[in-house]
Amino acid sequence: MGLPEDVAKRAAWYRSELERHSYAYYVLDAPTIPDTEYDKLFRELQELEQQYPELLTADSPTHRVGGVPLKEFPPRQHGVPMLSLNNAFAPEEVEAFDKRIRDGLETIAAVDYAVEPKFDGLAISLTYENGVFTCGATRGDGVTGEEVTPNLRTLRCIPLRLRGEGWPALIEIRGEVLMFKADFAELNARQRERGDKEFANPRNAAAGSLRQLDSKITAGRPLSFFAYGVGAGADALAVKTHGEMMGLLAAWGFPVAEERRVVQGVRGLLGYFVEIGVKRPGLPYDIDGVVYKVNRLDWQAQLGFVSRAPRFAIAHKFPAEEALTEVLGIDVQVGRTGAITPVARLKPVFVGGVTVTNATLHNEDEVRRKDVRLGDTVIVRRAGDVIPEVVAIVPEKRPMRDLFGSEPLNPPFELPATCPECGSAVVKGDDEAIARCTGGLYCPAQRKQALWHFAARRAMDIEGLGDKLVDQLVDAGLVHSPADLYGLTVETLAGLERMGEKSAQNLVAAIDKSRQTTLARFIFGLGIRNVGEATARDLAKHFGGLDALLAADSAALQMVPDVGPVVAESLAAFFAEAHNREVIDGLRRAGVSWPEGEPAQAGPQLLAGKTLVLTGTLPTLKRDEAKALVEAAGGKVAGSVSKKTDYVVAGEEAGSKLEKAQELGVPVIDEAELMKLLAKGVE
């Protein structure tokens, strides 16, 4: 039975509409329909393609959600090599470049140059055949890259079919994949919320996101693309200048830099460099310089190439964003999780587009390694949105006690023994670089984080008490510790922003409901470092009551399964702090209670001694439910994959954990196979 003609027309219409709206949203930044309408069109096309698989085409927008994970990236040879550019760092080098160009062209007249920002991302090449995107690859060594086509299809700003007309049968589009600063900040915020490792900078985030074997992970990352040239197929274009070529790329549907233009002579080059340098801090993406290219394409061909770089182009790199200044003092700051960070107070200095008065020293070990002291002259670096840091001292400028320079005037930095915010003890593990305040529940610097964690669903489960409301309560001085939550009234809450009487009543009811909890939830809610849900359950089961736990010494704590010296030290330090004991007593006085002395009855331990890792979205089970089932059967659920992992349970959109399992040869099972293990055990 053939494909109904009306169905084929409908699918073509859906594809055309979706690409039109995507182009308006992601390239023109001018949305034409609400997201809900776009999603509706997308789902209808998906349903058609599922019903009629023969409808699926290479340019279908449904490819943008990602597909089956790859085992590796195949190599891909570029039709025309992707050469690197020579660099210039000083005006004299730019003047020398311009002279070489004029000498090569045998002209004394000023040359027209196409100029544009140098994106700080990952260079890629996109191949289009008859206007349809068929292949994409990274730069690699310039001759051969890695094919990452499925991942590039997920970038909504890359056209799957070229717009307009005038493109040859085969053409390679060159450009850069990057991540906007705002998107990078949001991605790292999500990484923090999930407890995953944060990315160091937008470039690393873009590169890591593009080189995922599972394209569904790439689809979930906020990547962007800018086109800046053409490889194979350039000879077939009816354009005479690079500027005209960029206009053609924009007409075909590619994002191109708005800051590009054509300037004349070396004076125009240097003027553009200064202009972009001033604009740089306000640009939505990172750049590390500007690119100059001879504008006329016939002159580019005449000048040719030298070694592995074109003669007709050069990258003018920005200087390192560093400056010298004096250390006026070394303070310590307390983070939301109790981390103690030394910070250098500096004589104000202009660097990286802003006036810097403070710079991080990271931790005590770093201060000692760099030997930063009061009065030192130091090198301060700032790049983009990165927090300014002290790179090194200038030894010859250090203040000395005498003219002979035999002894420094100021002593080495010493970390304070107590927290400057609350006076609680500061501790640092033997194998840890970061020192921490032990006043978790009491410390003002940690107050918001402690309250948010205490109210979380897996802890005391106070529905409606989110981070924004916690901010209001703390900022208004209404709540200083978790115990204060139980004194809040409807009248007090109703006066807060976006909190009506009904919402206030619901929150007071949720707080009241949380008074009856379990010991495991209470322990987890205290936010003790290194004590997660599983450890909290083990502690509750082992000790049966809070008083027994409070009285336990390090040796007794290490009798609990999976509690070693590090966890025991965290528990002992937390409970030894008088302020934390006061908060616990306050919670008990507020009526927070739980059944004591009734450890849970263990069921059949069919997974005893087995370690499982959960990744992705399971068909019917929530992750919490799957974890509880595994632990009830005696198994352990770990957060990362290692050689000691027995099984990885993978659902939809499984990420890097699935890749790690495949790499290590760890068995991968689905939800159905997990249920069999829970019912019958390991055969």
Swiss-Prot record:
Gene Ontology MF term list: DNA binding; DNA ligase (NAD+) activity; metal ion binding
Cofactor(s) for this UniProt protein: Mg(2+); Mn(2+)
Active-site residues, as the UniProt record annotates them: 118 (n6-amp-lysine intermediate)
Record-annotated BRCT domain positions: 602-683
Positions of Zn(2+) binding: 419, 422, 437, 443
Keywords noted in UniProt: DNA damage, DNA repair, DNA replication, Ligase, Magnesium, Manganese, Metal-binding, NAD, Zinc
Annotated EC: 6.5.1.2
GO biological process terms, semicolon-separated: DNA repair; DNA replication
Annotated binding of NAD(+), by residue: 35-39, 84-85, 116, 139, 176, 293, 317
Catalytic reaction(s) noted: NAD(+) + (deoxyribonucleotide)n-3'-hydroxyl + 5'-phospho-(deoxyribonucleotide)m = (deoxyribonucleotide)n+m + AMP + beta-nicotinamide D-nucleotide
PANTHER family named among the record's database cross-references: CHROMOSOME TRANSMISSION FIDELITY FACTOR 18, REPLICATION FACTOR C SUBUNIT 1
Protein family membership: Belongs to the NAD-dependent DNA ligase family. LigA subfamily.
Function: DNA ligase that catalyzes the formation of phosphodiester linkages between 5'-phosphoryl and 3'-hydroxyl groups in double-stranded DNA using NAD as a coenzyme and as the energy source for the reaction. It is essential for DNA replication and repair of damaged DNA.
Protein name stated in the entry: DNA ligase
Gene: ligA
